[in-house]
Regions:
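Short, small/polar-rich motifs associated with maturation and membrane association
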Residues: 1-282, 294-296, 357, 612, ...
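Short, conserved phosphate-binding/catalytic loop or strand-edge motifs used
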Residues: 84, 277, 391-397
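Detector for glycine-centered tight turns/loop "hinges" at secondary-structure junctions
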Residues: 326-329, 428-429
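Short aromatic-centered micro-motifs
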Residues: 104, 322-323, 493
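Short clusters of small/polar residues that mark proteolytic maturation junctions
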Residues: 8-9, 115, 312, 334, ...
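Extracytoplasmic gating/loop element in the C-terminal half of outer-membrane beta-barrel translocons
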Residues: 203, 219-221, 396, 469-470, ...
Length: 700
C-alpha cells in the first residue's frame, strides 16, 4: 500500500505528487475463523505471517516456516529423521493425555492437527495466521482449544497465465566431527580402569569372552592389532542433500481462475539408505457462475515413501571388523545387535502413505449485506508399514529368530459446514457483522496388523509371513467411528471506527461422551479500542497505531479415543505355557501381572461420567506502530487454565482392570509475548528490516 498524503491546493493548478510506499500494510486483510477482517479491526490475539516473510529463509516444511516467526508458538524438532514431524505448541501444553496440537485449517478446510503439516508443500503457501487467544479460536470450539493455524494457499491472479518452477536444494552436515572413539588403545585403557574400579574383570586382557569374541590386550592393540574401523565414515552421509521441486501453472479470465501444481520432495537422512520421498499434486478452480454466485473446488494428493535406517554407528566398537574371513558380515557371537551395515542391508522398515484431500464450496451473495457459504470437505488417508528383522542381527537387542510384520490403516474424514454472514453499516458510525452457522464432522478409521516370529526361511522376509512359526502368529484389527455436531455464531460491532466488540459462541456435541455430557458450550468475548483514532492521541504525532485489546473465552478438548464411556467386550488369544490361551473379557487385554503372564488385565471399564476438558483464557494486548508504520510493536499477556483434565488413572490389579479414563486435575499456562518488527529502508527494489520475537510461558 501507499501512504495517505495531504496537499494544500492554494493557488496552484498543477501538482507533483510522489507515491510513498507504506512500510507495513496496516489494513491488510487477515483470515480469521469463518471470515476475514482488516488487521486494524482485530480484537483477538492473531499473528499473521505473509508471503514476503515466508520466502526469507528456505524451509522444507511448514513447521519450519513457523519456527521463530510467531511469539508464543513453539516448534520443536524432536527427531532428525527425514520427513519427521515437529511438535508445534501454542502457549504451552494444556492437556496431560489429550491432544495438545493446534488445529490446522487450509483454505477454510479443517485439515487436522499440526502433525499433518508435512503433507503440505510449503512452496504452495501464501500466508499463515495463528489464532492464539480464546476469542479468536473459540469459534472452532473443541477443535480450537490448543490454538488454530490458518493457511492460505496460492491462487491464480485475474487475467494472468503463469508457469512457475521453484527449486530448493538444502545441503546439510555435522557442525563438528562426531565425538567417537578414534584411539582403540586409549579406549581399552579407560575401559579396563573403569571395570577394575567397579570391582569387575577387565575385558581387554587378550582373552575370549562367553560369546566367543576375542578382546585383545592393550599390548596387542599397541603393536599387532590392525583393525580400527571408522564406523561413522561407513554409515553416515558426509553431506546429506534434500531437493524440493515444484512446477505450478496458473491461468484465469474474467470468470474462472485455475491453478495446478506438481511437487517432488526428496529428503536424504544422515544415515545411508535413510530416505523420505513425497510426490504431490494440487489443483484448485474457482468459477463465477453468476455475478453473485461463485463455486470453488480443490484437491491435494500427497504420496509418501519412507525407507528407515537407524544407523547405530555410535554403538560399534572400532576393534570389530566389518566382514569376517569369508566375506560375510562379522558377528558378535551367535547373534549381533549393533552391526550397522548388516542392519542396513538385511532389515526392512518401509512405509508408504497416500492422502486425498478434496474441498468444494458455494458462495452466494444473496444481498449486498448478506452472504451464504456452504462447503464440503473429504479427506482420505492410508498407510502400510512393512518390517522384517533378521535372525542374527537386531537393532534393539531382542532376537526372535526372525520377526516380520505388516501393519496398515486407513481413515476417512467428512466435514460439512454452512454459514451466513450479515454485514451492514448504520448511520455511518455503527457497523454490525453477524455470522451464524452449522458444522458436521464424521470420522472413521480402520486398521489391521499381521506378525510372525521364528522364520524357517528368510529369503522373502515379511512378504511370506507363513514361513514363521505358527505358534507365534499375531493378528489384530480394529475400527472406530466418531461424530461431532456444532452450531456457531460470531457478532462483531464497531462504533465510530474506534471501539470494537466481538462475541463468539459455539456448541459442540461429541459422540465420544455419554448422553449427560455430550454437549458443551464455548463462549468468548473481546474488546478493542483504537486509541490512535482519538483526537488527543493524533495531536501527539507519535503513534500511527495505538490499540489496546482485552479478551476472555472458553474452549474445550475431546482428545480421547472413542467408546471410553461405553461398556466393551472383547477376546484376546495368546500363546502361553506351550498352548494357545483365549482370554475373554470387557474390552481388550492390556497387561499381565504374576508369573508367566497368567493373569490378564482389561481396559474396557467405562466411565459414563466423562466430560469435556475446558480451557478458560484471558488475554490483554497492546498494538503500536511508529514512523509511518515502519516500527511495529505487539505485546500480549495471557493466563490460560485447563480444568477437568482427561487422563488415564491406574486401577488396583485386584479389580481385574488396568486403567480407566477420568476427569481429574488442572493445568495453568501464563506468559507474555513481544514482537517488534521494523523496516529501516524500503523502495521498489530493496527492503531492509528485521523482526524480534520474545515469549515466555510458565506451565504449572
Amino acid at each position: 500500500g501507499y501512504k495517505t498524503q495531504t496537499v494544500e491546493v492554494g493557488g496552484r493548478t498543477s501538482f507533483n505528487i510522489v507515491l510513498v510506499e507504506e512500510a507495513t500494510a496496516v489494513d491488510e486483510v487477515v483470515v480469521v475463523g469463518y471470515g476475514q477482517v482488516k488487521k486494524s479491526d482485530l480484537t483477538g490475539s492473531v499473528a499473521s505471517v505473509k508471503a514476503e516473510k515466508l520466502t526469507d529463509i528456505p524451509a522444507n516444511s511448514i513447521d519450519g516456516l513457523l519456527q521463530g516467526r510467531v511469539a508464543g508458538v513453539q516448534v520443536v524438532n524432536s527427531s532428525q529423521d527425514p520427513g519427521a514431524s515437529s511438535t508445534v505448541r501454542i502457549r504451552g501444553n494444556s492437556s496431560l493425555n489429550g491432544s495438545n496440537a493446534p488445529l490446522v485449517v487450509i483454505d477454510g478446510f479443517p485439515w487436522g492437527d499440526a502433525g499433518d503439516l508435512k503433507q503440505i508443500n510449503p512452496q504452495d503457501i501464501v500466508s499463515m495466521e495463528v489464532l492464539k487467544d480464546a476469542s479468536a479460536s473459540a469459534i472452532y470450539g473443541s477443535r480450537g482449544a490448543n490454538g488454530v493455524i490458518l493457511i492460505t494457499t496460492r491462487k491464480a491472479q485475474e487475467n494472468v497465465t503463469r508457469i512457475t518452477l521453484r527449486q530448493q536444494t538444502t545441503i546439510s552436515g555435522f557442525s563438528s566431527e562426531l565425538n567417537l572413539w578414534r584411539d582403540p588403545v586409549l579406549m581399552a585403557m579407560l575401559s579396563n580402569e573403569s571395570s577394575i574400579n567397579a570391582g569387575l574383570t577387565p575385558i581387554y586382557i587378550g582373552a575370549t569372552n562367553a560369546n566367543g569374541v576375542y578382546y585383545p590386550s592393550i599390548a596387542e592393540l599397541q603393536t599387532t592389532w590392525t583393525t580400527n574401523t571408522r564406523w561413522d565414515d561407513l554409515v553416515f552421509r558426509p553431506t546429506p542433500v534434500s531437493n524440493n521441486t515444484t512446477v505450478q501453472v496458473q491461468s484465469s479470465n474474467d470468470r474462472t481462475m485455475f491453478q495446478a501444481s506438481a511437487n517432488y520432495y526428496l529428503d536424504n537422512g544422515m544415515y545411508i539408505e535413510d530416505t523420505y520421498r513425497k510426490y504431490g499434486g494440487n489443483f484448485s478452480v474457482e468459477h463465477k457462475l453468476l455475478d453473485n454466485l461463485r463455486m470453488k473446488a480443490s484437491a491435494n494428493i500427497p504420496s509418501i515413501k519412507r525407507h528407515n535406517n537407524g544407523g547405530l554407528a555410535y554403538w560399534r566398537n572400532p576393534i570389530f571388523p566389518v566382514y569376517d574371513d569369508n566375506g560375510d558380515y562379522w558377528l558378535y557371537g551367535a547373534q549381533d545387535y549393533s552391526h550397522p551395515l548388516a542392519l542396513t542391508d538385511l532389515q526392512k522398515n518401509d512405509s508408504k502413505g497416500l492422502d486425498i484431500i478434496s474441498f468444494a464450496s458455494v458462495n452466494w451473495d444473496v444481498l449486498p449485506c448478506l452472504n451464504v457459504m456452504a462447503q464440503f470437505n473429504y479427506k482420505h488417508g492410508e498407510q502400510i508399514t512393512d518390517k522384517y528383522f533378521p535372525k542374527k542381527y537386531s537393532e534393539t537387542g531382542v532376537f526372535n529368530d526372525g520377526y516380520g510384520s505388516i501393519d496398515n490403516w486407513k481413515d476417512d474424514n467428512i466435514v460439512f459446514e454452512a454459514y451466513a454472514t450479515f454485514d451492514r453499516t448504520f448511520a455511518e458510525k455503527h457497523r454490525l457483522t453477524v455470522m451464524g452457522g452449522y458444522s458436521y464432522e464424521n470420522y472413521q478409521s480402520r486398521s489391521s496388523s499381521l506378525a510372525a516370529k521364528g522364520f524357517i526361511n528368510e529369503s522373502l522376509g515379511n512378504e511370506n509371513l507363513a514361513a514363521g512359526d505358527s505358534e507365534t502368529y499375531s493378528i489384530g484389527n480394529g475400527s472406530y467411528k466418531t461424530e461431532l455436531v456444532s452450531a456457531l455464531t460470531r457478532i462483531n460491532y464497531t462504533f465510530d471506527n474506534r471501539f470494537l466488540f466481538t462475541f463468539t459462541a459455539r456448541a459442540d456435541g461429541s459422540s465420544k461422551f455419554g448422553s449427560n455430557n455430550k454437549w458443551a458450550f464455548f463462549p468468548s468475548g473481546a474488546f478493542s479500542w483504537k486509541m490512535h483514532e482519538e483526537r488527543f492521541i493524533r495531536n501527539l504525532n507519535v503513534f500511527d497505531v495505538l490499540k489496546i485489546r482485552a479478551s476472555y473465552g472458553i474452549s474445550g478438548n475431546q482428545g480421547i479415543s472413542a467408546y471410553q464411556t461405553l461398556s466393551r467386550y472383547g477376546q484376546h488369544k495368546y500363546f502361553n505355557g506351550g498352548k494357545w490361551v483365549t482370554a475373554i473379557g470387557p474390552g481388550y487385554q492390556s497387561g499381565y501381572t504374576g508369573q508367566d503372564g497368567i493373569y490378564a488385565l482389561w481396559s474396557g471399564i467405562p466411565n459414563k461420567g466423562l466430560k469435556w476438558e475446558t480451557t478458560a483464557q484471558v488475554d490483554l494486548g497492546l498494538d503500536m506502530s511508529f514512523f509511518g508504520n515502519r516500527l511495529n510493536v505487539t505485546f500480549d499477556w495471557y493466563d490460560k487454565r485447563t480444568s477437568d483434565l482427561l487422563r488415564e488413572r491406574n486401577i488396583a490389579p485386584s479389580s481385574g482392570y488396568d486403567k480407566m479414563w477420568v476427569n481429574d486435575g488442572e493445568i495453568r499456562n501464563r506468559g507474555i509475548e513481544l514482537t517488534i518488527d521494523g523496516v529501516a529502508f524500503q523502495n521498489r527494489d530493496w527492503r531492509v528490516g528485521g523482526t524480534f520475537v520474545f515469549s515466555r510461558n510458565r506451565n504449572k
